[in-house]
């Protein structure tokens, strides 16, 4: 009888763990950036940069989804963004990244002014215009966590 109770307990724990790993929101996160900005991930492809209002609230996007890489210095936040496209395998409007729709963004931290979307050539030109150091290199968001 004791073994039966332990077995039931273990089964319930296992089922609970499986249910929790399937719950939306467990993989969501935010990463703080300079100037009260954050990278905010609300789902696999909804990753954006927004101003941080409080510990759990953010303002409207300043760099839209899907942000895949970022870098920053004392004056600027740089970002690489992929546009989204409807998933051809889904009929419910689910969107996936479009690797052919690449944009770059520069956010001036002090003023909040945003430059973008930019193609790669214009991005490099703006970096040079703003005298952003070549040591400020875009990094994948997954590597920053």
What are the roles of these predicted feature ranges?
Residues 1-23:
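Sec-dependent bacterial lipoprotein signal peptides
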Residues 14, 28, 58, 88-91:
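Intrinsically disordered, low-complexity segments
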Residues 23-72, 82:
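N-terminal export/targeting and maturation segments
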Residues 45-63, 94-119:
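Surface-exposed loop/turn elements that mediate protein-protein interactions on large endomembrane-trafficking
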Residues 84-97:
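Short, conserved, GDST-rich strand-edge loop motifs in beta-rich repeat architectures
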Residues 109-145:
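C-terminal partner/receptor-binding element of secreted or periplasmic proteins
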